[in-house]
């Protein structure tokens, strides 16, 4: 279960968007926004969480909002993105194009040839 924002740390809201833009590590985002996290979840899903956070942020309009409101929304968005992956496997969300395009339940497209790897290795097998 995800932790709620009541468990979070205080946040320095001054110029929060510019500060977020300068961050690179997922842990830095969690620290800057005061969002608690489980390192095990972040180790497995960090790219997915950050990608999802970016998708959620892109849908927001922060123009003309005070920094405290922007910080609160960014914190809520990061919590939401984290919770998406804290309770289910990253593959189930398919946030990256390569995962969206690959559906293991879909049959092979007609006209595409699948060559098993074994067929390449047979000439190299020791006799």
From Swiss-Prot:
Name the keywords, alphabetized.
Nitrogen fixation, Plasmid
Q: Name one GO biological process term.
A: nitrogen fixation
- Report which gene this protein is encoded by: nifW
**Superkingdom of source:** Bacteria
Keyword Ribosomal protein, does the record have it?
A: no
NCBIfam families the record matches: PRK00810.1
Q: What is this protein called?
A: Nitrogenase-stabilizing/protective protein NifW
Function of the protein: May protect the nitrogenase Fe-Mo protein from oxidative damage.
Q: Where are the transmembrane segments?
A: none
> What subunit structure does UniProt give?
Homotrimer; associates with NifD.
Q: Pfam families, from UniProt?
A: NifW
What stretch or stretches form a coiled coil here? none
Similarity comment text for this entry: Belongs to the NifW family.
| Organism of provenance | Rhizobium etli (strain ATCC 51251 / DSM 11541 / JCM 21823 / NBRC 15573 / CFN 42)
